[in-house]
Amino acid sequence: MADVKKVATRVSYGGALVELGNERDDFVVLDADLAAATQTGKFKAAHPERFYDAGIAESNLMGLAAGIATTGRVAFASTFAMFAAGRAYEQVRNSIGYPHLNVKIGATHAGISVGEDGATHQCCEDIALMRTIPGMTVIVPADDIEARACVRAAYEFEGPVYMRFGRLATPVINDREDYEFKIGRGVVVREGSGVTIVACGLMVAEALEAAEALAADGIDAEVINMHTIKPLDERLVVASAKKTGRVVTAEEHSIIGGLGEAVASVLAEQHPVPMRRVGVRDVYGESGPAVDLLHKYGLDADGIEAAVRSVL
């Protein structure tokens, strides 16, 4: 996909906030001294009266967002995934999740692709943490178009939402007239009958590339873009598994508690089939160029292709 347009979903997040802010005035944006990196600085420049910086105090950021939400306004709380899901977990759980407030968490710089920032900033556990909070919706958009759509959908959705965005520029794959984003509804981006690949985030583009390589050997892979991890589109997962008989999941996250385990739980209860999970395998990351790290940890088309071949 060398010639395909690439955009980091964190950039899409910042742009979408500005667009939405130009249309609606009933929401605010908050950050924790990372507005340039999370791209919320764009919103600050356009609508300074609706932007709040909590400083390097992520727990306070979430508490402030919760308080604002109790006044009837939607609050977008933005920081790195490591800090949003890690440092501020208690406040997200108790101050936002428990009262089911209208706070939308924009968690950027998620996963191994943070790159040179290293293991301390490469959050590969956030989906697992957020999935366990009752009533929390978890979204991992695959590209620029989907990231922008998910921001608008989150704004319109009643209740807390965790949106996961990346630092690395990734291929735009949803540039088509019939594209539609619905929370909780997965999308079949490639029809197939031999194996199902369920992916999220930047791994969707990698899954499509793997499917093309597999097709050269007569292996017909169906690829599902599962942008919403919670609530999971269980009906689509089961229907595809019944059609293909084999499932591989792919995520830029730990294989513990993420998309893979969510899909495995559904299949174990409703339609067991042979399955493999592509993801970070219970290890910390390390410092290095994002693309090199993704390859090292098997989070690319080659890793997905190998997993598919092992399950056939």
Question: Where are the regions a protein language model picked out?
Answer:
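Thiamine diphosphate
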Residues: M1-R164, A169, E180, ...
